[in-house]
Amino acid sequence: MTAPERRASAALAAIFALRMLGLFLLLPVFALEAVHYPGGDNPLRVGLALGIYGLTQALLQIPLGMASDRWGRKRIIQAGLALFAIGSLVAAWAPTLEWLTLGRALQGAGAISAAVTALLADLTRDAVRTKAMALVGISIALTFALSLVVAPPLVAAVGLGGLFALTAVLAVLGMWVVARVVPPEPPRLPTAARASLRTVLLDHRLARLNLGVFMLHAVQLALWVALPALLLQAGLEAAKHGWVYLLAVLAAFGVMGALLFRLERRGYLRAVFLGAIGLIALAQLGLWWSASLGAPPLALLALLLFLFFIGFNTLEASQPSLVSRLASASQRGAALGGYNTLQSLGFFVGGVAGGALLALWGIDGLFLACTALTLLWLLLAWGMPALPASAPQRRGAALAATDTKT
């Protein structure tokens, strides 16, 4: 990476991390703290308050992605962070569950993922884009694991309202990073050069990746519905769960960093892509078998989590990179908007379906369903054509062709 690429990658990863930290801190404590609000004893209303964020995200990813194509990435990112901060303040003040739900909806309306990812693609070359996306993925995954450790003592100190106020502060800090640290974005293309939304949505290669990220995050959210109970069955108290997640994430990133970029440079990205899906399927199958044991060994669960995160982190880095390569510069905001829309819908469906499967079929039934869904994804992905090469690979192929002619 060049110095400007490193600066852009680090700054945009920091924006993602600041925003996601505010969200992830809520996950382990929201349902427990919501009971203190009027109506908080109704699981459906609590679930709506938690999940409506994903719904408004899904509705606005494409419009805001297209807006970033038209009016500029940084302008849309700033507006989205401001809206996220306003929603956080509404939720911090909320005297009732209805106001809390409104605050969460406003948070979700600040749907900047497509614009941030498109800006990262604009500021990096093909050859290093997967590495840049991986840096964003690392920041999000580490933020998630860290939040599971620090959220319980933090909410005990400041309450749920205090957590929402903290998310507003983090959003404002993100706005400062956009204004002062992120490099200037490249000039926008004229309106006539921009592709239509229909062109992006009908691209079968992008559709495969969009379907893939939907399945990936549906499986991930369903996993978190059942995994804490499985760790309790293994004899690990809830206060220590976050450390298992953190260690698994760190170890998985070490493996991904050692293998992914090296294999991508050698032209094996398709094999890595399919292998990562296979690892997730293997992890889900192992979790199904572990659940059937009644009291699974903790070491086995840790190993399966490690395998899951290798696959998950690899796909989180490679899929948006591929979307940005397949879409032209004039399409990136719209294409990544579609991608992030399906990602948000995956969150929503995974949480709802995971809860329903757990209620109907138990933990082992949930993981069996996740295994089947992942195997279906592997089957669909197997028919993908050769994935686009990065710039060095294309140059190498051109040189080889020249040598052959001479």
Spans of model-derived segments:
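Conserved MFS/SLC helix-loop-helix module at the cytosolic interface between two early adjacent transmembrane helices
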Residues: L59-P95
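C-terminal transmembrane helical hairpin of 12-TM major facilitator-type secondary transporters
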Residues: R270-Q319
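Helix-to-loop junctions at the C-terminal end of transmembrane segments
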Residues: L60-G72, G254-L269, L358
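C-terminal membrane-cytosol helix-exit motif in multi-pass small-molecule transporters
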Residues: A168-P187, L380-P385
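Cytoplasmic membrane-interface "Motif A"-like loop-to-helix N-cap segments
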Residues: R70-G80, R265-G278
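Intracellular juxtamembrane helix-capping segments at the cytosolic ends
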Residues: I112-T124, T314-A327
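Juxtamembrane intracellular "pre-TM" segments in multi-pass secondary transporters
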Residues: M1-R6, V182-G212
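Cytoplasmic helix-loop-helix junction between adjacent transmembrane helices
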Residues: G103-I140
